[in-house]
Amino acid sequence: MQFVLHKTASGVTRARRGTVHLNHGDVQTPAFMPVGTYGTVKGMLPRDIEAIGADIILGNTFHLWLRPGTDIIDKFGGLHKFMHWDKPILTDSGGFQVFSLGAMRKITEEGVTFKSPIDGAKVFLSPEKSMQIQYSLNSDIVMQFDECTPYPATHDEAKKSLELSLRWGQRCVDEHKNLGSTNALFGIIQGSMYADLRKQSLEGLLEIGFDGYAIGGLSVGEPKEEMIDVLDYIADDMPADKPRYLMGVGKPEDLVEGVRRGVDMFDCVMPTRNARNGHYFVTGDADNAGVVRIRNSQYRTDEGPLDPECDCYTCQNFSRAYLSHLNKCKEMLGAQLATIHNLRYYQRLMQNIRDAIEQDKFDEFVNEFYSKRGQTVPELNLR
């Protein structure tokens, strides 16, 4: 993997424009990665994902390991061939899914024992096993196995958790090397909401050495203000010559705020999940903060496109009234068209951000973005 930093935005912002060169292609940053948990982005054919402009998607190590299993995916030569996607794939390590199991899991120094959510069988996942699974999947970007610190957590709990993740991180690097993998391996910064612990985690990861660095342990129930605080005091300390990835975040404004603080990569289920629930992201609509809730009665006879500024297949061919009809009837096509639009909205957002950085107009872009949504630009408190 190679990361090339092309430009940093002018002014006080830390926004960056770059390219991540990976085994299956290049990723233009800042980038948003659609989530394909089970080897598919819900409601999307691979050609649809490419058409909306995605350079990279995210797969889920935990779920693909349990079903269909790496033995089956191995027969196809990896996840790319299994799902017919020839561009880059990032896979998470399984740490967040294990975290979400709650009482169903037991964490030790060696790894995590839990009951499979599929059949209740006892399963063990370790840093080494996570690396082996991701090696079988042939992910372009492999994530270290970590413990996602819950929120809230005491200082002692968060410290103990991050130190376990650091030890696991070293084991991940060792196993990654033993496997002879040529794919990139990213470390994950933990430490809950504590500035000193976040810095301790980052320093520990830098000593181990990774190809890129991710900010984990956010979007786990904390107030947005605390999430932004973490970004304010950690993002700029991350190496300038490595990709910076904010995991599991989020709303369009969260992406903009992450970019303002120097983040390069994002993923979240929000655009696809919200699409299935009839919530569509649009460029304007200041009265509704950039969201059309298609179930509202006002759209029942609306002849206009979902988003007049959008070039996606949905907006170019269908009215809000038709989308309202499909949603009310619970037709599969409605969810598919909604997903196409929401993911295209996110990709257009990132493209517009990249263009604005290149043209030294990022501050103007930010002002216009919030103005169209009827929102004020949040303060930037970089430390």
Swiss-Prot record:
Substrate binds at residues 92-96, 146, 190, 217. The active site is at 92 (proton acceptor), 267 (nucleophile). InterPro entries: ArchSynthase1/Queuine_TRR, TGT, TGT-like_sf, tRNA_ribo_trans-like. GO terms for biological process: queuosine biosynthetic process; tRNA wobble guanine modification; tRNA-guanine transglycosylation. It comes from the Bacteria. Pathway: tRNA modification; tRNA-queuosine biosynthesis. Binds 1 zinc ion per subunit. One of its GO terms (cellular component) is cytosol. The keyword Nuclease does not apply. Its EC number is 2.4.2.29. Zn(2+) binds at residues 310, 312, 315, 341. It catalyses: 7-aminomethyl-7-carbaguanine + guanosine(34) in tRNA = 7-aminomethyl-7-carbaguanosine(34) in tRNA + guanine. Its cofactor is Zn(2+). Keywords: Glycosyltransferase, Metal-binding, Queuosine biosynthesis, Transferase, tRNA processing, Zinc. One of its GO terms (molecular function) is metal ion binding. Disulfide bonds: none annotated. Catalyzes the base-exchange of a guanine (G) residue with the queuine precursor 7-aminomethyl-7-deazaguanine (PreQ1) at position 34 (anticodon wobble position) in tRNAs with GU(N) anticodons (tRNA-Asp, -Asn, -His and -Tyr). Catalysis occurs through a double-displacement mechanism. The nucleophile active site attacks the C1' of nucleotide 34 to detach the guanine base from the RNA, forming a covalent enzyme-RNA intermediate. The proton acceptor active site deprotonates the incoming PreQ1, allowing a nucleophilic attack on the C1' of the ribose to form the product. Homodimer. Within each dimer, one monomer is responsible for RNA recognition and catalysis, while the other monomer binds to the replacement base PreQ1. HAMAP family: Q_tRNA_Tgt (MF_00168). NCBIfam families: Q_tRNA_tgt, tgt_general. PANTHER family: QUEUINE TRNA-RIBOSYLTRANSFERASE. Belongs to the queuine tRNA-ribosyltransferase family. This is Queuine tRNA-ribosyltransferase.
